Amino acid sequence: MKVSIIGATGYSGLELIRLIQQHSSVDIATLHSFSNQTNLLSNLYPHLKNLEASPLEKINPKDIIEKSETVFLATPSGISKDIALPYIDAGLNVIDLSGDFRLKNSQLYEKWYEKSAPLENYLMRAEYGLAEFRENKESTFIANPGCYATATLLGLAPLVKKQLIEPTSIIVDAKSGISGAGKVPSTSTHFTETNENMTLYKMNSHQHIPEIMQQLTKWDESIPAIQFSTSLIPITRGIFTTIYVRPKKPIAWEELHKLYESTYENAPFVRIQKENVYPTVKQVTASNYCDIGLAYNEITNVITIVSVIDNLVKGAAGQAIQNLNIMANFAENDGLGFIPVYP
């Protein structure tokens, strides 16, 4: 299968390129960038010297449609909603890594993203691509989930789908590595600001909140809201999410563990930890895994869920390829079947 990547020079686009090199059935047809349209990729990124024959081309929809079966959009929010339309209309597989098509309510999109919403008919056609819980596996237009949303939803799904928790009890403390802020530098991502530091940001206003709520209320419509905080931590990549919920009735750890194991028994990239073992960011680095650890406090009647992913892989490019594999009926782990980088 031939694919094109629009936004190839951003972190998610670069990760798509890396992962596709390992895929048995996918080859890159064209690469595109808004900021660098006439350069060789290897000139910008020497670590990709093996790809010297891969030029960055101007975005020409007609040319892309002729050369590709699938288009990955690794662009910032606010861009995909316009440039995706020719490829959707032409019947290509389209996987958008931005937030443009995730929210079905256009007013919510405009409130949380502070941009004009995509056209309604395209919003309705997009399938939310939480890979382990895809509703329509034949959909050819995928809104790839956000990194925080992926870690949070995979952590909560077994309990919420069974409606086992108090609807008002969900508290999520999510932390991200610096690459989650993207490639464009800013004061908040400057080395001197992030090194040996931890910063709370977008308190109660992160754009992944409505995305998480949209999916949670599909599973349990009684959930009114979540308390969700995000922090920047001084690591390059990774999402570390700690989730606290109250079960409707006490639950033994063994029962809790069995619930998670059974939910994800056919999910090759979700790994449930043993008792008193809690995942670290390091154990999923550069992989498509989501590792989940569980604890239950009988005294407070609180379940603690620790869910970790690599924000650039499972939280972006890896899940996008996983969604392509599902869509094209490839092996789900094709291009993704490698162990994490350690140490």
From Swiss-Prot:
Main location (coarse class): cytoplasm
Catalytic activity field: N-acetyl-L-glutamate 5-semialdehyde + phosphate + NADP(+) = N-acetyl-L-glutamyl 5-phosphate + NADPH + H(+)
Keywords for this protein: Amino-acid biosynthesis, Arginine biosynthesis, Cytoplasm, NADP, Oxidoreductase
One Pfam match: Semialdhyde_dh
Gene Ontology BP terms: L-arginine biosynthetic process
GO MF assignments: N-acetyl-gamma-glutamyl-phosphate reductase activity; NAD binding; NADP+ binding
One GO cellular component term: cytoplasm
Keyword Amino-acid biosynthesis: yes
Pathway(s) served: Amino-acid biosynthesis; L-arginine biosynthesis; N(2)-acetyl-L-ornithine from L-glutamate: step 3/4
Enzyme Commission designation: 1.2.1.38
Cellular localization per UniProt: Cytoplasm
UniProt superkingdom: Bacteria
Catalytic residues of the enzyme: C147
Function description: Catalyzes the NADPH-dependent reduction of N-acetyl-5-glutamyl phosphate to yield N-acetyl-L-glutamate 5-semialdehyde.
Record family assignment: Belongs to the NAGSA dehydrogenase family. Type 1 subfamily.
PANTHER family given in the database record: N-ACETYL-GAMMA-GLUTAMYL-PHOSPHATE REDUCTASE, CHLOROPLASTIC-RELATED, N-ACETYL-GAMMA-GLUTAMYL-PHOSPHATE REDUCTASE, CHLOROPLASTIC-RELATED-RELATED
Protein name: N-acetyl-gamma-glutamyl-phosphate reductase
Native species: Listeria welshimeri serovar 6b (strain ATCC 35897 / DSM 20650 / CCUG 15529 / CIP 8149 / NCTC 11857 / SLCC 5334 / V8)
Gene from which this protein is expressed: argC
